[in-house]
């Protein structure tokens, strides 16, 4: 009996030891070059845990196709440089439009800027209408037009680049109709070529995402400042004033509008401090803008205002502005209110206009984009 009890005890001890051994980790697991089922499973990537692109990411990566219609003002030179540097924008066409320049006279200078300085060789440049739709005959002062036609005496490289043979409005139509996605129009001069495009082919409005406009003054005074010849007008802004009829047609087209009027672009001063940040830049576009701003300091005897480049910013970065909505219109009848932009109480969510901006943040953003920092 004693022997049987001892044997039974030994068996219990043996089973206890074996159970402890089974609980110990396999010593081979941590040895290099030895694979076990457990270590192999640890190295397998779980595809469900991978970060995959989302539709939101894809939309963020997609650039906005933009047609830029300008009238050759100094701010347009800055605006085009900004557009070319903005990674969220794809410039698909440029129109030399009516306004501060004669579109034909300045076309070769703008071709040199577009193709030789900014290297935008794939972007077509077309000449817009040289006369407004509005029969009033109002125009910018002659001295301004002469300066604009000479690209403000800024030195440009020689260029034999061909200008698109199509009329400005026709290039707009063709680009919109052939685009796989909706187009954004940025207009910083008169609305002449946009109105002509809509007259010739009204169906293009279906492929226009939005028209972004620098023009008008809703709550602010106008900026003619007695320079409009015999016209006595304290309420109009130049871009609307010189072709109020075209502006009225665009405003009433039903296409969503984003307006940066004098209200939303006022007090955007170019200072010596801002210009100093361009100095020493190796980029050809930055060097040209630096040269232009130095000339503008001499013309204005100090700091000067820009209006068009804030409108370019509004395409991708509306957060720098305060916005209101409404039904918008333009007074096109000849008289003291010719070219005045007005807003009705009836709210139209498709239309928005800026009533103010954050000057400091806006300036920093523009320089960050232009200087690619």
What are these regions (language model features)?
Residues 126-159:
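Surface-exposed loop and adjacent secondary-structure segments within mature catalytic domains
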Residues 58-70, 74-112, 157-259, 265:
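Active-site histidine-anchored catalytic micro-motif
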Residues 50, 59-64, 79-91, 238-241, ...:
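Conformational coupling and interaction surfaces
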Residues 129-134, 215-218, 261-268, 334:
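Glycine-rich beta-alpha junction loops
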Residues 24-26:
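Bacterial signal peptide processing site
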Residues 33-64:
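N-terminal low-complexity, Pro/Thr/Ser-rich intrinsically disordered segments
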Residues 1-11:
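Bacterial N-terminal signal peptides that target proteins for export
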Residues 19-22:
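C-terminal motif of bacterial Sec signal peptides marking the signal peptidase cleavage site
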